[in-house]
């Protein structure tokens, strides 16, 4: 079985942490969410109790949010060119 990564690195050294947290910790952030992208902390939080297939799906979804933030910082602000 493939494990979920604890860190992902986008181009230009944009590092993202992936944390699998308890229901209590997730509920403090957002009781209605199973996954959260925190742009300030550059961290994706996933609800640990969910089946791994569901966590993978949520990770992919949250990576989409992270990618858009990366794009805004590096492409839209002129740090990189397509």
Per-region residue spans from a language model:
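Catalytic zinc-binding patch centered on the HExxH motif and its immediate surroundings
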Residues: 1-11, 17-43, 52
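Residue-level recognition of the GNAT/N-acetyltransferase active site
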Residues: 47
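Histidine-centered divalent metal-coordination motifs
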Residues: 61, 65
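Post-HEXXH active-site segment of zinc metalloproteases
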Residues: 30-33, 43, 52-57, 68-82
């Amino acid at each position: 079985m493939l494990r979920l990564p604890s860190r992902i690195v986008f181009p230009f050294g944009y590092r993202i942490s992936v944390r699998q947290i308890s229901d209590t910790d997730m509920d403090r952030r957002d009781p209605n969410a199973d996954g959260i992208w925190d742009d300030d902390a550059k961290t994706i939080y996933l609800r640990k109790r969910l089946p791994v297939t569901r966590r993978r799906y949520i990770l992919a979804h949250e990576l989409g949010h992270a990618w858009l933030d990366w794009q805004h910082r590096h492409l839209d602000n002129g740090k990189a060119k397509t």
